[in-house]
Design a protein with these regions (language model features):
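Face-selective signature of the C-terminal outer-membrane beta-barrel domain
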Residues: 3, 320-344, 375-534, 567-571, ...
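Short, acidic, small-residue-rich periplasmic hinge/interaction motif at the N-terminus
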Residues: 28, 40-44, 77-79, 91-135, ...
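N-terminal periplasmic accessory domains that precede
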Residues: 94-100, 142-145, 184-187, 201, ...
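Surface-exposed extracellular loop regions of Gram-negative outer-membrane beta-barrel proteins
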Residues: 411, 526, 537, 570-615, ...
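Outer-membrane beta-barrel translocator/receptor signature
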Residues: 196, 211-218, 226-283, 315-319
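Short acidic/polar hinge/loop motifs at secondary-structure boundaries
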Residues: 64-66, 175-203
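Outer membrane beta-barrel strand-and-loop segments of large Gram-negative receptors
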Residues: 439-443, 485-491, 604-606, 610, ...
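Short, acidic Ser/Thr/Gly-rich low-complexity loop/linker segments typical of extracellular
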Residues: 46-62
Length: 854
């Protein structure tokens, strides 16, 4: 196999130059002589007005095309400039072309008319969403923006899923940045959407990138313009919850952003404050059974019934800041330093009214025991965090080297008080939770293009992450003094992981049509875990007693990737790709801390979780027209040891416990279609996305261990056909007035022990600009139908339960943004941290990276 692989690479390198001649060029501003990056260069042949090929310029304004022998017309264009044409003849020798575009005052005015731009760009191996073009992003958090992205879902607790799976990595500027399942909900809720340039969705990344996250990567690329001059913006906004269970003050946000480019130095600075308020509620209807529950409730098995209604209010303010400098020390040499920091003080108020009745089926009207109580929660937290990066970039001819070092640190401290009123009795409790995580990453990426059609990449990536979590709880008196400790709620856990990764990828292009890339990543992974709890007598015990082999683990594994794409011409392109990925449990999934905000429903992590592996296969098709784009794909994911949430009844018969478990296998076979259309001139941009898939979860019959107890788990197999549809319509009413409607629907789907009901939502937004677009006013209404809720039906040994949770209520926000400085000179710019695509667009001509933005 190794000989075959080596021979294939050698043949690809040797054979590449014979298929096409190289056309190189540069696009500049005729007045300032400044390079124009992201300018479009189209290739026309004969009298056919449809381009036969196209590309965009890089940050130096340069482009490369590979064309067969013949005569062509090259057309260079960019918003606000008159297009320019050049006739070229290719005859087996390199050709050089230079464009000097001039500003067109009429076109600049026209650009104002269509200035809403495109909020989505299609590529075969990823989808890119421009945050600024989404009206709903004004004054919003990153978490709220993610709710409007196709294939992405954000639940009521801030958990993020991609294609129906929470096994997704969230990166910032191409790096993990310390975000994990335990802290990313709070971080993204506090991070202003205005700091994000674009969001990249990559469902099948190549071997160049970490294999973590079986569903793929969501990469947040932060703003860092490098256009010449000095410019920035100031923003302020207010938002208000319209359906509040309590009288809640409005939320607010303010922000300041500045960018500058002074030749050898460019930089940016951003700071903002956000005060967030939201209100929600919950409903629980649980039946305890003499037997095993099923999808349909069997009333003859009921022995008790719990009903609950809860009201929630979340508030909190926080600061978020970013800064960065790039020093262009010499031609092709750049040193950069950047970072962001945040600190917030979230608060949560929760009140749950419970009624628990015990009875027999024949005497339900006269319960033997009727227990009613109210439990109030008042939590205050402190949440600091940040990331710093130092990097170096070298580019010369066909070689590029990127070296970076990153440090991140996030903490979360929360003290929660509980007051439970049951009849004439009142009890007081508190729970103290402390957590901290630190990480470093050192990486080096090298790229070499032996020919215009080929690319070789190799690199090394070292990561080290440490985390610690501590929690304890007490019974208190009315004054808040501790009476005694609640031993079952004590936990002290820590973890250290290290990973050494090496990768190599190689890609080539043949006959100007066929592109192939293969890659291999090897990782040596090490993990050390510590976890302690207290028994009923208060003695500290080791959670891994008798399971020391799970305390320290280390292993070496390979993660291959392969991509084959074919360009049929006339805007048709097809790609087949395969990757192997992993989901290593971390964060709250393995944290044994028990949360008892609801004394009848306790959640904790499972220290015995194992990694889950997936094999992912995708077939993607992309077709572009002048005003329409269609992206369609078929995907198959096979996961071994997939992690699922499981529920079981405690031995007291009244308390439900929730944790995580490795199920045997999980499969998904689906179709994803995304269409983008410009209709009625420039009046309407319509983006429609749809996912339809078959989901199968295998049966589980195993034992689980917690605090010295053995819990048998029996889960039946589940399968269902499910889907989701999302429509985004952007209207341009006048030159300065635009609107947006986003509607979404998701069908019922299965989980390990039940089903999640269908859901739907509707958001509206309006934007009006003044003073030549320097001043923008935005009005948004989120969740117009007040329908964003998660409803589950779950069942198992001894129970059947319906639950509904609502994190937010309907809300309205108003935001004002003022832009200042050299705004006209700004252009879209390639950002550091742009992943470039799952299969890495290994031909800089853009042939395998079709830019289908409008």
């Amino acid at each position: 196999m190794k000989k075959l692989f080596s021979t294939l690479l050698l043949l690809l390198v040797i054979s590449a130059p014979i298929f096409a001649a190289q056309v190189t060029g540069k696009v500049i501003d005729a007045g300032t002589k400044q390079a124009i990056d992201f300018a479009n260069v189209s290739v026309l042949k004969g009298s056919d007005p449809a381009p036969v090929k196209g590309t965009v310029t890089d940050e130096k304004g340069e482009f490369v095309l590979d064309l067969a022998d013949g005569s062509y017309t090259l057309v260079a264009s960019f918003m606000g400039y008159s297009e320019q044409k050049r006739e070229v003849t290719v005859a087996g020798k390199p050709v050089q072309v230079r464009f000097a575009l001039r500003e067109d005052s009429k076109m600049l005015q026209d650009v104002e008319v269509v200035g809403q731009g495109s909020s989505m760009r299609f590529e075969l191996d990823k989808k890119v969403f421009t945050v600024d073009q989404n009206i709903a992003s004004a004054g919003a958090s990153v978490s709220e923006v993610l709710e409007n992205i196709p294939s992405v879902e954000v639940d009521q607790e801030g958990n993020i899923s991609l294609r129906n799976s929470e096994d997704v990595e969230i990166w910032i500027n191409g790096k993990p940045a310390g975000l994990n399942s335990e802290n990313r909900g709070q971080v993204l809720q506090q991070m202003p959407a205005g700091t994000i340039e674009k969001i990249e969705l990559i469902t099948n990344p190549s071997a160049k990138y970490s294999p973590e996250g079986t569903s793929g990567i969501i990469n947040l690329v932060m703003k860092k313009d490098r256009a010449a001059g000095f410019y920035g913006s100031v923003q302020a906004g207010i938002n208000y919850a319209l359906a509040a269970p309590w009288t809640t003050p409005p939320g607010a946000n303010v922000g300041f952003n500045i960018n500058f480019n002074a030749g050898p130095v460019d930089g940016y600075f951003n700071v903002g404050y956000r005060y967030h308020t939201s209100n929600g509620g919950s409903i629980t209807d649980r039946y305890n059974l003499d037997g095993t529950g099923s999808e349909k409730l069997d009333s003859t098995l009921i022995n008790s019934h719990l009903t609950q209604e809860g009201q929630q209010s979340h508030r909190g303010g926080g600061m978020f800041g970013r800064a960065g400098l790039n020093f262009h020390v010499a031609q092709g040499h750049t040193i950069g330093v950047s970072g962001f920091g945040m600190v917030s003080d979230p608060k949560v108020f929760n009140s749950i009214n419970s009624n628990h009745r015990t009875y027999t089926f024949t005497d339900r009207l006269n319960p033997a025991n009727n227990r009613e109580f109210t439990r109030d929660q008042n939590g205050n937290a402190y949440h600091p965090g940040g990331m710093a990066t130092l990097d170096y970039t070298f580019e010369q001819d066909a070689h590029k080297l990127y070296v970076s070092g990153t440090y991140n640190n996030f903490g979360f401290n929360m003290l929660t008080g509980y007051t439970q009123i049951e009849g004439v009795d009142t009890t007081y409790q508190d729970q103290n939770s402390l957590s901290n995580g630190q990480g470093i990453e050192v990486k080096a990426d090298y790229e070499w293009k032996p020919t215009p059609q080929s690319r070789l990449e190799a690199g090394y990536d070292y990561t080290r992450n440490w985390s610690n979590s501590f929690a304890d709880a007490h019974n208190n008196n009315a004054e808040g003094a501790h009476i005694n400790e609640l031993f079952p709620y004590y936990s002290d856990a820590s973890g250290l992981t290290q990973n050494h990764a090496f990768y190599v990828t190689y890609g080539n292009r043949f006959w100007d049509k066929l592109s192939i890339q293969v890659g291999l990543r090897g990782e040596y992974y090490m993990r050390h875990l510590e976890s302690f709890y207290k028994d009923k007598d208060g003695n500290v015990q080791d959670s891994y007693a008798g399971m020391e082999n799970k305390k320290d683990t280390s292993y070496f594994q390979l993660f291959p990737s392969a991509y084959i794409s074919y360009d049929f011409g006339n805007g048709h392109e097809l790609q087949l790709n395969y990757t192997r990925r992993v989901n290593r449990p971390w964060g709250h999934q393995i944290n044994p801390r028990m949360d008892f905000s609801d004394s009848t429903n306790i959640s904790y992590g499972n220290v015995n979780l194992l990694p889950a592996y997936s094999n992912n296969l995708e077939l993607n098709y992309l077709k572009t027209w002048e005003r329409h784009t269609l992206s369609a794909g078929v995907f198959w994911k096979y996961r071994e040891g997939a992690v699922q949430n499981v529920k079981y009844m405690d031995s007291d018969g009244r308390t439900m416990k929730n944790t995580y478990l490795n199920v045997a296998t999980r499969q998904e076979l689906g179709v994803e279609v995304v269409a983008k259309n410009r209709l009625f001139g420039e009046l309407l941009q319509l983006t429609t996305s749809a996912n339809f898939y078959w989901n199968n979860i295998s049966a589980v019959d195993q034992e689980m261990y917690h605090l010295g107890d053995t819990i048998p788990v029996h889960l039946p197999g589940q399968n269902i056909f499910a889907g989701s549809v999302r429509v985004n319509a952007q209207f341009l009413f006048t030159k300065n007035f635009s609107g947006q409607i986003t509607a979404a629907y998701r069908s019922p789907r299965v989980v390990a022990q039940g089903t999640t009901s269908h859901s739907y939502s509707l958001d509206l937004g309006l934007r009006y600009t003044l003073l030549n677009k320097q001043l923008a006013l935005a009005l948004n209404v989120r969740d117009v139908l007040d329908s964003r809720a998660r409803r589950n039906i779950t069942w198992g040994d001894g129970f059947w339960q319906f639950s509904e949770n609502r994190w937010h209520s309907r809300s309205v926000s108003f935001t004002i943004t003022y832009n200042f400085g050299n705004q006209r000179g700004r252009r879209p710019n390639r950002q550091d941290g742009d992943l470039g695509g799952a299969g890495d667009d290994f031909d800089d001509s853009g042939n395998t990276n079709t830019d289908s933005s409008f």
